[in-house]
Design a protein with these regions (language model features):
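Intrinsically disordered, low-complexity segments
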Residues: 8-9, 29, 33, 86, ...
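Serine/proline-rich low-complexity intrinsically disordered segments, especially terminal tails, linkers
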Residues: 12-13, 33, 37, 149, ...
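Conserved hydrophobic position(s) of the canonical leucine-rich repeat
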Residues: 1, 75, 90, 102, ...
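Concave beta-strand-loop units of leucine-rich repeat
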Residues: 79-86, 107-112, 122-125, 131-136, ...
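N-terminal capping/linker segments that flank leucine-rich repeat
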Residues: 13-82
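Well-ordered beta-strand segments characteristic of repetitive beta-sheet solenoids
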Residues: 3-5, 14, 60, 76-80, ...
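Leucine-rich solenoid repeat scaffolds
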Residues: 1-34, 178-181, 188-198
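LRR N-terminal entry segment and analogous cap-like coil->beta motifs
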Residues: 54-117, 121-123
Length: 198
């Protein structure tokens, strides 16, 4: 209790609130949008990736390597579960097929560890990008580019991501919040942050 008073918040509660966020849904009668606080519930001791998540026609839930190929122009949300797609043969993940409608890209912890390049260029509807901890952590000389994403508002990278990547470019995005965790881009030689939408 003293720590909460001293720091002004409970770090655990703050982290939980941050993970919960708001789920926005459209009312069936067309009366508008309703915002609900919601979170995927699990049983105690059960990882989120063990829970069967239901996907709709516009959501891609990546649970294994084969799911990476399930993208098309109708995908609006991509969620990658914890610890998946860590085959050393997966060095690049091309998301261009869903560049026009993708609104949200959320990676769980410790996934896509051998990917060397992630380019999100010209994603006109993209609003939120979240990388969990330890993503892209077993590849060297990698490139992360996020550019010309005018609708992008939130970009978060968890601790220990892209450790040995050499380039991080973010330009011409409408980003309001950028959060980079500890130990990310440790060996980065080229870092560019530019905005044409100020």
């Amino acid at each position: 209790m003293e720590r909460i008073v001293r720091n002004g918040k409970s770090s655990l509660l703050y982290e939980l609130a941050d993970r919960i966020g708001n789920v926005v849904k459209e009312e069936e009668d067309g009366s508008g949008v309703v915002s609900d606080n919601a979170v995927a519930m699990t049983r105690i001791g059960q990882e989120l990736d063990e829970v069967e998540l239901k996907s709709n026609a516009h959501t891609l839930i990546v649970k294994n390597d084969e799911d990476l190929g399930g993208m098309d122009a109708t995908i609006e949300v991509i969620r990658v579960m914890n610890g998946v797609c860590n085959d050393s043969d997966i060095e690049e993940w091309n998301l261009n097929d869903c560049s026009s409608k993708l609104k949200e890209l959320v990676l769980g912890d410790n996934c896509l560890q051998f990917v060397k390049k992630m380019k999100l260029v010209g994603f006109t509807s993209l609003e939120k990008v979240v990388f969990g901890t330890g993503c892209f952590s077993n590849s060297e000389d990698g490139l992360l580019e996020v550019s010309d994403c005018k609708e992008l508002r939130s970009f978060k990278v968890g601790a220990g991501c892209c450790v040995d990547w050499s380039s991080f470019v973010m330009k011409n995005c409408g980003v309001v919040e950028v959060s980079i965790g500890d130990g990310c881009f440790v060996n980065c030689e080229n870092t560019v942050f530019e905005s044409g939408y100020c």
